Regions:
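HINT superfamily self-processing domains
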Residues: 1-182
Length: 182
């Protein structure tokens, strides 16, 4: 899913990686902001902000480092030491192979709000010093429907929850359809 709202995102005020970069809480990121990609070689434009209210279906939180409090859901990949890692590596096959973290710092989510960014370019950004993937890239069809007023923000989130919570068996097909049509 996503990240806790106090998670820090690395931003570029002018859309370049040579600018003075700043960190901002993910809950303060807006569509149109430029985030730094996982490799710090380019910026990606934020196209949509996922906001998930607390749910009993939310996964636990993790951090790949025992010195950092857990901030990412266990199924959200992070780019650590040159490879993609997560606690639950089976949910997003279109992202490629991820190494399962067995010694992650894990805790219960305890009803926290979760957020994620959909971004242009390679679909990545940096949270709390680690690369991550938007999972949805720029959002494809769902983003276009939102931008054209066909779907509200809540409508987009309802579709996301349906495929993630109720029909995870076809989430890959739904993702590919959205990319193709977007």
């Amino acid at each position: 899913r996503c990240f806790t709202d106090e998670t820090k995102v690395l931003l570029s005020p002018d859309g370049t990686v040579i600018a003075d970069l700043i960190e901002r809480s993910i809950c303060r990121i807006k569509i149109g902001d430029h985030v730094v990609n996982k490799d710090r070689t380019a910026t990606n434009k934020v196209t949509f902000v996922e906001e998930h209210e607390p749910s009993d279906k939310d996964p636990d939180l993790f951090s790949p480092n025992e010195n950092i409090p857990p901030f990412a859901t266990t199924n959200h990949p992070l780019f650590v030491d040159g490879e993609w890692v997560a606690v639950d590596v089976d949910q997003y096959p279109w992202l490629g192979k991820q190494r399962p973290l067995r010694d992650a710092n894990v805790e219960l989510i305890n009803g926290r709000r979760l957020l994620n960014l959909w971004v242009s370019g390679d679909g990545t950004y940096i949270v709390n010093g680690f690369g991550t993937h938007s999972i949805m890239y720029d959002g494809g069809l769902l983003k276009n429907c939102y931008n054209q007023g066909i779907l509200t923000h809540e409508g987009v989130m309802k579709i996301m929850r349906f495929y993630m919570d109720e029909r995870s068996d076809i989430v890959t097909g739904a993702f590919l359809f959205g990319r193709l049509m977007g």
